[in-house]
């Protein structure tokens, strides 16, 4: 059965084991059980993770349409009031699953990815889960400099990434990374956040999860 369309261990994960947890309840289990993402099981299915199937089994529910969400616990403190942002447990869990995958991938190893994501969330005054998912897919449209960075080292790293210099150790160390980093910071007029310095670079952002009426008036334009 497809739990999104219309199915005995009760997992109670310790806080911190998951990027996001949703407490679901059903007529058969009004106290509810926690389901967490990303799924850590051996069987990986983006639509029906083990964690969700085990949760539905514990709730004696065939689908999420038979469930209600009671609580949400998210690892990013900037995202608040998530439970009130959704009309159905099904949509909430869909987005929680995707959030778990975004968290697990961490930008496929891109440097400073998590700090950049959190800096963008702060810049855009984002408190919604759906908008956070969209911003995670639009990070290439933001310039970012981490806090506490070695300006010269980061400037060299940025120059290689931007194709300004080849990834040659000899050329890289001879390059004035500090001047390049400072020039980029000045060009974009970066804002200061708790996780670094960030600004929208003017690229066209695409939105898959969030609706325009839920975008903050502060969204950079």
Predicted region positions:
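Generic structural hydrophobic/aromatic packing signal, biased to beta-strands
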Residues: 22-24, 35, 53-54, 132-135, ...
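Short, extreme N-terminal segment that most often corresponds to the first beta-strand
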Residues: 6-42, 219-221
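Long, highly charged low-complexity segments enriched in Glu/Asp and Lys/Arg with interspersed Ser/Thr
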Residues: 178, 182-216
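Short, flexible beta-strand-to-coil junctions
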Residues: 23-30, 57-59, 193, 201-202
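Residue-level signal for functionally critical sites in structured catalytic/ligand-binding pockets
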Residues: 25-29, 151-156, 160, 169-170, ...
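Generic alpha-helix signal with a bias toward terminal, lower-confidence helices
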Residues: 34-36, 47, 170, 187, ...
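Mixed-charge (acidic/basic) macromolecular-recognition segments
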Residues: 1-11, 41, 45-169, 173, ...
């Amino acid at each position: 059965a497809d739990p999104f369309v219309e199915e005995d261990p009760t997992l109670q994960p310790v806080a911190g084991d998951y990027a996001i947890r949703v407490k679901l309840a059903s007529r058969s289990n009004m106290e509810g059980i926690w389901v967490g993402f990303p799924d850590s099981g051996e069987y990986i299915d983006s639509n029906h993770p083990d964690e969700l199937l085990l949760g539905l089994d514990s709730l004696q529910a065939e689908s999420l349409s038979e469930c209600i969400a009671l609580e949400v616990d998210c690892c990013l403190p900037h995202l608040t009031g998530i439970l009130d942002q959704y009309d159905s447990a099904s949509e909430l869990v869909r987005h929680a699953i995707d959030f778990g995958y975004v968290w697990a991938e961490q930008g496929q190893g891109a440097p400073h990815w998590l700090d950049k994501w959190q800096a963008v969330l702060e810049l855009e005054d984002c408190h919604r889960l759906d908008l956070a998912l969209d911003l995670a897919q639009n990070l290439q449209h933001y310039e970012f400099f981490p806090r506490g960075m070695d300006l010269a080292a980061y400037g060299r790293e940025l120059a290689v990434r931007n194709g300004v210099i080849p990834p040659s150790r000899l050329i890289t160390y001879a390059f004035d990374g500090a001047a390049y980093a400072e020039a980029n910071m000045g060009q974009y007029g970066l804002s200061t956040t708790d996780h670094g310095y960030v600004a929208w670079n003017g690229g066209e952002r695409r939105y898959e999860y969030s609706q325009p009426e839920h975008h903050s008036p502060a969204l950079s334009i």
